[in-house]
């Protein structure tokens, strides 16, 4: 029914699925162009458009909305405005857009890197740190993307200028294994494991984000690591259609660093069949 209905619409005014980019980075990444091509070839018209533009689309996939942290209020309002159109549940994405979700997962029994959320007031930050035995710690914005403004400090060091960090910050212990072991990302489609990669920081770098020239390595992971990551997803009130579970493997145990439910890089081009698996799960969502 949906496929037949779409043929009656002016393609210049309407499309079945919009994969949103952003005004800051409007170009579509190549691996998502392959998703667009496969979906369109299979009868699901798909376009790219910045999330800040007016959308006329049944479904929205915000996988390249890479600037939302800089326009957070507008972005969350946009999600609420189009809440019934998103591939992933809107309430899950709103929850996931602020790193306070890590505290929730911690409270739900997930093995999460210890996380404190507090205001940007120096006195509050120092009070929070006093009760922690962290020789080194990391401070980052509570709303942030791609490792921006992530800073490592030693106890007693002067805090950086926090004027660009927003209203709240995240405090976490520095985990040296991130630099040595890298960060392992497990990608799931509708709760089913698809593939995994490891982001390995270069020498003398400890951040595992792409802007820091990490090496992206496809990896096989042990079944118990997959089960641990899957367990994280089953803690959620709804199962996301797509999810990336990021963590560091320390002594063969998975320590959760991040759960990405909005605009994760899915590394579809790094594993044979990954694009096809993603397209299949999108089709099932759209055509059900």
Where are these regions (language model features)?
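Active-site nucleotide/adenylate-binding loops and adjacent lid/helix of ATP-dependent enzymes
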Residues: 17-21, 78-83, 87, 91-181, ...
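Conserved N-proximal alpha/beta basic substrate-recognition cap immediately N-terminal to
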Residues: 22-119
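Hydrophobic residues on conserved beta-strands that form the core of alpha/beta folds
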Residues: 112, 171, 242-244, 256
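C-terminal active-site "lid" helix and adjoining low-complexity regulatory extension at the edge
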Residues: 238-240, 249-288
């Amino acid at each position: 029914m949906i496929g037949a209905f779409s043929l009656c619409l002016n393609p210049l005014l309407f499309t079945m699925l919009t994969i949103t980019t952003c005004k800051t980075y409007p170009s579509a990444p190549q691996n998502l162009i392959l998703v667009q091509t496969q979906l369109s070839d299979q009868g699901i018209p798909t376009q790219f458009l910045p999330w800040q533009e007016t959308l006329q689309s049944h479904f929205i996939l915000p996988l390249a909305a890479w600037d939302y942290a800089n326009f957070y209020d507008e972005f969350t309002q946009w999600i609420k405005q189009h809440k019934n159109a998103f591939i992933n549940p809107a309430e899950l994405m709103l929850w996931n857009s602020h790193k306070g979700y890590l505290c929730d997962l911690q409270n739900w029994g997930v093995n999460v890197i210890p996380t404190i959320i507090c205001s940007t007031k120096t006195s509050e930050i120092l009070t929070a740190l006093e009760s922690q035995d962290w020789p080194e710690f990391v401070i980052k914005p509570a709303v942030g993307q791609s490792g921006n403004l992530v800073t490592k400090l030693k106890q007693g060091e002067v805090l950086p200028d926090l004027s660009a960090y927003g209203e709240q910050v995240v405090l976490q212990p520095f985990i040296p294994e991130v630099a040595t072991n890298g960060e392992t990302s497990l990608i799931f489609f509708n709760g089913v494991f698809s593939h995994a990669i490891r982001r390995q920081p270069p020498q003398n770098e400890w951040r595992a984000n792409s802007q820091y020239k990490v090496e992206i390595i496809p990896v096989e992971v042990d079944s118990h690591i997959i089960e641990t990551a899957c367990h994280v997803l089953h803690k959620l009130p709804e199962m996301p259609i797509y999810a990336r579970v990021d963590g560091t493997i320390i002594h063969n145990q998975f320590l959760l660093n991040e759960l990405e439910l909005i605009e994760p890089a899915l590394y579809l081009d790094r594993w044979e069949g990954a694009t096809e698996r993603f397209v299949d799960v999108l089709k099932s969502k759209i055509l059900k």
